């Protein structure tokens, strides 16, 4: 059975590893794309929108809904990537915890 000092050291080690993983995620750029890459967005891992690029060919004043859908798709694509990487990197730290 581990003593208290050993458990504290292990907890500190896990905390440091988790912090490093969080920093890696925050420093990663995630690119989301709509169909045919007509709209692209870049997010940092902390979910800050860094850029939004729209192909001029899809800008149609008569049909703003299509552009809105493409922007939504690109944003959701990037956020989904962030969520997936976050789960991969940080999920190992929370598995088995009672919350």
From Swiss-Prot:
Location in the cell: Cytoplasm, Nucleoid
Q: Does the keyword DNA-binding apply?
A: yes
Q: Which SUPFAM superfamilies match?
A: YbaB-like
- Cellular component, GO annotation: bacterial nucleoid; cytosol
Keyword DNA-binding present in the record's keywords: the answer is yes
* Keywords, sorted A to Z: Cytoplasm, DNA-binding
* GO MF annotation: an example: DNA binding
* Self-association state and partner proteins as the record states: Homodimer.
- Reported function: Binds to DNA and alters its conformation. May be involved in regulation of gene expression, nucleoid organization and DNA protection.
Instruction: Tell me its family.
Output: Belongs to the YbaB/EbfC family.
Protein name as catalogued? Nucleoid-associated protein llmg_0128
């Amino acid at each position: 059975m581990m003593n208290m000092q050993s458990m504290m050291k292990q907890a500190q080690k896990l905390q440091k590893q988790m912090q490093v993983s969080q920093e890696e995620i925050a420093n990663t750029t995630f690119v989301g794309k709509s169909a045919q890459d007509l709209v692209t967005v870049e997010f940092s891992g902390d979910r800050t929108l860094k850029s939004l690029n729209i192909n001029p060919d899809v800008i149609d004043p008569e049909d703003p809904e299509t552009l809105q859908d493409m922007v939504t798709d690109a944003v959701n694509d990037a956020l989904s990537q962030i969520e997936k990487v976050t789960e991969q990197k940080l999920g190992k730290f929370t598995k088995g915890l009672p919350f």
